[in-house]
Amino acid sequence: MPTAATETMVHLSDVVVMEVSNPVFKQKHATRNTLARNRMLARLTEATEQGALLATHDNAELMWLRRHVGTDDIAEPEPYLFCFQHDWDALTSAERALRTIKGLVEFHPDWAFWGYDAALLWGLEVPNDLLGPRFLVKTGCSVPLSAGCRLLRPRTASALEQVDGVWVTPFWRTVEDCLLRAPFSYGLAIADSALRAKGVSHDDFCERLCIDCEGRRGYRRARVIASYADGLSENGGESRFRAFFIAYGFPVPELQVEFRDPLDPNQVFRVDYFWRLEDGPCVIGELDGKGKYTLQDGGDRESVDPFVAERQRESHLTMLGHKVLRFTFDELKNPGKLAEKMRLAGIPQRADLAEEWRRQWYGR
């Protein structure tokens, strides 16, 4: 019969054995953690390269990712969708929306998108303020209404097309859906980019809109947007400033007018806006200092400091005898001050033009 002392020794012996095996267990556990971490970081990298958020159907992976959100540079910007935090921080609002959509499609391959989401996938200019709740087509799939999704019942399911692996409404249906609901300046950005992307004429665009949308809610305003659309506008910012000129009674400028550099005949400057004024010098308008140039001989421009290049470019344009008026995007937040700036530059503001636009837009 063992004594109490013997029982204690056996117990202590067991503890010693456990202490010996513990480092081995810890090493194996650390190895498994390292392998899991490397695997998940590799998957995040792959998703980033594909322009999507990582969506996982594996519960163990989901638990690992959520444990490491806020560490290891991992973020969960949308439920069940993950990415690197530094990468997400560097994205524009449009890029974030696109990656979110592509991540959602990993979970729901039967989902289809319309409106502003579809416009993004088609490569159209969609202002950030229009990005928010997802625009989903009702195709019999399960849709989380609690997420604030906006549903559309398409006329025919066969009308859907795929863009980058995502089901969307056709190009022109997408444009029309956007114009039927968008504010004027935002809708003009979308309409301009549609004309630019497809190279169709302004008249053909207006005719298509009339055939497809007459009688639909929002058609009158969509028609107003289409009437001012111009495919020469190169980005959404240029379109929104042009919308301001229209709504506030300023003459609509010519777009993307080219001028030869008076000091270098091989270089041609292309300006955003150009007003030919009856009284006084003409005015060149430039947005955000993003000057554009082309070399006639097809050569490469030597790399120079962008600020210095812009100042030189502006001085050369002034040599042509034109005023140069620069706009910054924040100026749209203070339309009264922006209008005063344009008047001081010699661009006439006409009350009758502003009133004409108001009658068109508001119907009175």
Task: Identify the role of each PLM range.
Residues 1-218, 349-364:
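Short gly/ser-rich loop at a beta-strand->alpha-helix junction or flexible surface loop bordering the NTP-binding
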Residues 11-46, 51-52, 56-60, 195-364:
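Surface segments flanking catalytic/ligand-binding clefts of nucleic-acid enzymes
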